[in-house]
Amino acid sequence: MLRRTSILASIIALAAVLRLWGIGSAPPALQYDEAVNGLTAAGILAGEHPGLLMQKDGREPIHFYLVAASIAVLGKTPGALRLPYVLASIGLVAAVWLLARELFGRKVGWLATLLCAGTLWPVYLGRYGTRSVFFALVTALALFSAARAWRSRAIGWWVVTGLLFGVSYYTYPVNLFVLPAIVLVLAGAALRRSEALRENGRGIAVMIAVTALLALPMWLYRGASLTQSFSRPQHLAVFYAGQGPVDFVKTLAAQTVLVLRMFFLRGDANPLHNIPGRPVFDAAMALPFLLGLAALAQMRYRRRGLVIAAWAALFLLPTFLSKSAPHFLRAVGILPVLFLFPALGLLHTHRWLRQTTNRAVANMVVGGLMAVSVFVTARDFLLRDFLNSPYVYRAYNGEETSLALQINRRLGIGWTGSNLVTRPGPVRDSMHIWVDPDVWDGNPYAQFLVPGPLDEFPGLHTLSSGAELTASAGVLFVHPQNVAAWLEHIPAGKTARVQPGPWLHDPDTKATQRLYHIVSW
């Protein structure tokens, strides 16, 4: 028992290291969605309560409250904002262990868990502060609970399953596929006239009732806010009304290739989701994945295999049906079952090698494949410092976030570039900063990361027509078009120094301009 616990603890520790490394400083910026999430969470701490769907694209609420709890303890830093998502990603590793062990035993459980701990997709998913990872965690736990309930026939486990599936409707929009997935699995069991289905009939009814009861407020809210709920899916859809048959077939073929090749050839190209173009699995896991897929077709695994394959196929639909395929966030629903495939392949490889050679060779080959896969992830993600690369910095809106860093470093408080916990005051008495509304108002990054709003925080002021600049040292953050006007207001006898701010390229207008200038004296 102690040995088994130690193995699992070691895998969880590996997952934690890969996900928590440099959390306070890498990347040294906030992406727009992260900043908006942070502002919403800060609003909760101020007494505001978001609805069931927030923002124009309809964001579910659970993660806002988790982020609020984190920043209440650690302060408003990127690391504090991302910590709940990192913990959810680590929790996903444990949930995969529970599910894999329940379905296929302890050995597959360890293998699947190690793969989840060391594969780039779930590692990076936790470092990007958006809500998709919570769906993967909750549904992995729900599938484990369902498997335990099916085996034990215990009503209590069916209730837990219903609660978890219900909670999934408050996590991420791919939850719209949860009910179809349940129906598909039950329909398959009914077609096979499973005795276990009849024995679990009452429990399944309880699960569905609990799921529906918990999800009902979200369903009603979505029904009353159809434009908010479905405008983005309609915008992203690759199939549309009036599409010609030739175009439909071409799109169908293209999407199929794009989605299927993500596993071994070319994955998500977005640096917010992935090392651009990197497939889900490296070369070391390609053959084990295919062997595991074949193993699930064997008679001894067939029922479980059909459930796993049906779940995976259904939750590939969100990326298959939308633009920018493959999209790792939209495909997040497959993560609970994804690592079962290579884990089974590795198990069968080990058994075959043990029978044809000996245990030492089997251990060396399977262990070597696992070690190579984990090393490749650590090398590409950590050793090559992916999160601090220039294109990742740009993808995370590093230029816009720099305003917050410039302000906080001058005030000597808050997040100053590498700290997980916000630096406390007091503010330097001699420091006064004025920020141009043309710079501040469109910058949610600074609005979240700077410890307080303009004119309400010591030393931080709005640069408006009535502003009185102090005769002592001061700093202005001015929109480039307003610099000349404000240079005339510098206190007499002071020499103004103008430092150009970062460049920002607007892909829509193709224009490049300075975000702000720093005027100091």
Segments (PLM) and residue ranges:
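N-terminal secretory/membrane-targeting helices
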Residues: T171, V183-L186, M218, D268, ...
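Aromatic/acidic, Gly/Pro-rich catalytic loop(s) in extracytoplasmic/lumenal soluble domains
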Residues: E456-W521
